[in-house]
């Protein structure tokens, strides 16, 4: 089964041996970040540094100024963590090592944009703004995301792209010294806390028969027993319906899923129009369509009619593959994404068994997170699975 490893440009730039080491793992592809959010990343083998701090979301290549001239929303250039064309330099080294290179593009997740342009952010029913979560219902934000996807995905020499966060972002997000875990929200609470009440969403709810003020009040009322701990943290969509009312819950979902589907269709079409023939477009996806986050909630049948396939989180189990496999689209890529960094909850020692379970559940490829972050021991375990014992 084909495997690809996720990589950051700073893992490769300045380390002459990095590309060869990654190729030596037995992967055929490198999925290389070209647009990425803020992070603090370990580089345990780099000859010049051990910690890279990306201070804000940025593109990791020179911005095309002509594309963005006169626009308030535009990509930010990277700082010292990825100067110049860091993506291009890393991509060249990886290709020279014999790897196919695909871009890795993070889209609707940008805390700096939310700080500098607060009106772009998701606003919850209490009036709190989520700076990390651009509202994908807003016209200017959608236009920004489409052009960012085209520019960051179709880089010179790239054979395909993987689009992360192409959908709604909500409450869930690792934030600075995060302290919001005191109450277990579960799927239902997360959904209610992720409903947006910006001007665009308020109008959208109105188009589906909901008064936005009444809806916000209903959401706050529905959450009261959650804050008191009187509601189980699990329960999924049936609990959303119980807390908010079936018709109201359904109307919010129709609005939000329509917004996400149309954005996904528009972005994929724009990337394909800009890319050479055969360019592969995958989405990082969750088969539960009302979910938010890096793995966008999607309708499996719809997304496999739009994109060439999906990258599915499987570290916690391969169950999320099943709804995609059930669509019966033999040509679609179903990539099972496993964290192989032990210190981040991964289990590289069980990769062979995990991969076998993923294949049985319908996976056609593997994604391994992450070749730059993993320890030598973790990478040795991966290499053994992909290439056999030394």
Language-model features and meaning:
Residues 129-270, 285-287, 293-300:
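Polysaccharide-binding and catalytic clefts of secreted carbohydrate-active enzymes
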Residues 31-56, 83-127, 160-170:
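Glycine-rich, aromatic-flanked loop segments that form ligand/cofactor-binding clefts
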Residues 171, 273-318:
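Substrate-binding cleft/loops of secretory-pathway carbohydrate-active enzymes
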Residues 10-24, 139-152, 290-305, 321-322, ...:
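Short, acidic/polar
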Residues 4-12, 65-84, 128-143, 248-259, ...:
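The substrate-binding groove and active-site-proximal loops of carbohydrate-active enzymes
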Residues 16-43, 151-160, 300-313, 360-364:
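Catalytic domains of carbohydrate-active enzymes, especially glycoside hydrolases
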Residues 4-6, 102-156:
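Active-site-adjacent "subsite" loops/lids of carbohydrate-active enzymes
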Residues 307-321, 337-390:
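Substrate-binding cleft of secreted/luminal carbohydrate-active enzymes
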